[in-house]
């Protein structure tokens, strides 16, 4: 099993008031559905620290799937929905190796909103 990951991070420093809610709404109403069942993607998580950063963490089936997505996304990153909501392009688009994933006793809980 491959651990081909990608992190995309936006800064929320100086972002408009209400950006955290707008991002959570966008994920719940649009982005979650886009990535659910996506070929080549094992899973994606969306993470945020209010006033600091918002990011997507992706794990792909292999490096080829990650590289293809990364190339496609990087070309339009400045105009991506997250960039439009935040008002700036990502500050980081970085591949990584996911060393391991553990499923807890209560199982994974895929949800459009936590």
Segments (PLM) and residue ranges:
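A common structural junction motif
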Residues: 76-84
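Short S/T/G/P-rich N-terminal loop/turn motif that feeds into the first structured element of a domain
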Residues: 1-53, 63-72, 87-114
